[in-house]
Amino acid sequence: AAIKGVEMSLAVPPVAGPYRRGIPLRMTQAHCHSLSVDSEGGHSHEEPGPRRLLDLADRLPASASVTLFELDPNSNKRSQLISRLINSPEFSASQARYWRDVIFSRATEMRSRQMSPPVFQAWMTEQFEQKQSWDKIVENLLTATGDVRENGATALLFAHGGEAAELAAETSRIFLGIQIQCANCHYHPTDRWKRIQFHQLAAFFPRVRVRQKRDATPRSFEVVSQDASRRGRRSPSPQALGLMFRRLDRNRDGKLVKSEVADSRLARSFDRFLQRGDANQDGGLSLKEFQKLPPPGNNNRRFETEHYMPNLNEPGNRGEAIRPVFFATGGRANEGLDDLERRQLLANHVTSTRNQWFARAYVNRTWSVLLGEGFAMPIDDMGPEREVAHPEVFDLLCRDFTESGYDIRRLFEIIAGTRAYQRQIRPRDPTDPTPPFASAQPSRLRADQIYNALLEVLGVESTSLGRRSFRRRRPGQSNDMMSRRRSAGRTLFLALFGFDPSTPQEDIKGNVPQALYLMNSPLIHAMVRAGGNTRLARILRKHPGNDDAIAEVYLLVLSREPSASELKICRDYITEVGNRGEAFEDLMWSLVNSSEFLSRR
């Protein structure tokens, strides 16, 4: 099929089981020829295969494996490598780390970022190792209950404190690629979604609660369902309100202001009380205004079991009770369903084959992970009014993903098998009007990938990176203590280099703290020394000739050999410095600090 002048060779393998047979697809070669890219995937234009370990396993290859791969005459070596990686435990761990970043990068419950990521990551790794389908994973995330330190599937619910509006927004953004939260207070500015549709989605979640577990050590929370209303227990009498008012009115002027309630339970909500009850707009609440405050609606969820759409013209009004309806398909919830039944129904609607957005969101995101940009950008803001690049290809992949039973590995293998993916990554001129996907685009490595790459290049254990000092294991130190040190080092590094994977690549920028870390880290300086038993020292002892040593350093850090011009620059610099060890220290340090090391290039 000829699709807008782009050639990709997208071979879709047959689907196992009762699904249809695979669809072979070849696109025209005109666009690739216009960019002087060999449409048959010539060696000089192909990305070194082992570098793909970063994409699929979050780590760099050993320099020796790069050389062996390039020398291997097997014409199927790339497809074999990809298949081996996708079916490895490292792929499962890599995907778990990716989805950890997706969920927690926008968490509104800050405590979840300290408690949940390791548990979620372990649970998600297990899902991928068991080759769980994407619909089952999402179903578990939407219907989970239990201790957040024990059940990793509670991550999404805990990350947003069980708040219905936040969960509706993130469910749509992550799993459907639609940012329907823009319709929270008004019609969506660019898509057809209406305000009522956002609140109908939120109405699947009002009975979710996140509460602290009593006497739990260490401190923990649990996701539970609250199906019985407690409204009758929460409205104090006018007399009780009068006593509270007089106790808080410290200057006895008959008016409560913010400074007077600063140390009380009302402090967090006082601005909202003013907005709702300050009839004369004098910046305070009289006793009469205080007693007339409307009962809290959605803002005091402890007592609500239904979702209300606020009346924007009457802020003091709780609003209209909304019944659950899934906006993408129109699926409705019957009355009388409890929390778990509602969330299960929502999961069924979200993952249904009738809901095209479920497959579209995952396919678009996966294509972006591997090729640096999606068919629609941003990847979490597609929407029905957006155009996608090469819709025929996109629809083919979405249809195949759906009919395969949402087989994650199959989708990765199909995309990784395209010539667009296997070609050398080439930046595209943003002013170039030609279609995308002649090859993958440069993209910033995730924090885990940089961390693992540094471990490989420096030849150190993960007990050190991210920590202020480099300490080896002390005599008598337990494995558990070492494990905690490794975890702490990675956690600190992720806090410095982490970013939301849903962010478009052009919006991901390095910052000063990251640059200072790479330039000034005592560990990096210590491990790029030419003396002792560092990686660099061993390379220099192994290769007395400078050209071989330069090539080995490039293979170690960038997984490729230097170009002729790079080799000349290195030779000239070594001659200029006059000290072999010092010159190679500068070379290795500069490569570790290069944009190529931090990116897929």
What do the predicted segments below correspond to?
Residues 240-251, 270-281:
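Primarily EF-hand calcium-binding motifs
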Residues 99:
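Key residue(s) within conserved catalytic/signature motifs
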Residues 2-29:
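N-terminal pre-domain segments of enzymes
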Residues 458, 465-475, 479, 483, ...:
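Long, His/Glu/Asp-enriched segments that create or flank divalent metal/ion-associated functional microenvironments
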Residues 19-22, 30, 34-50, 55, ...:
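Primarily short, surface-exposed interaction patches in extracytoplasmic proteins
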Residues 252-261, 279-290:
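Acidic Ca2+-chelating loop motifs
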Residues 186, 271-274, 291:
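Residue-level detector of alpha-helical secondary structure
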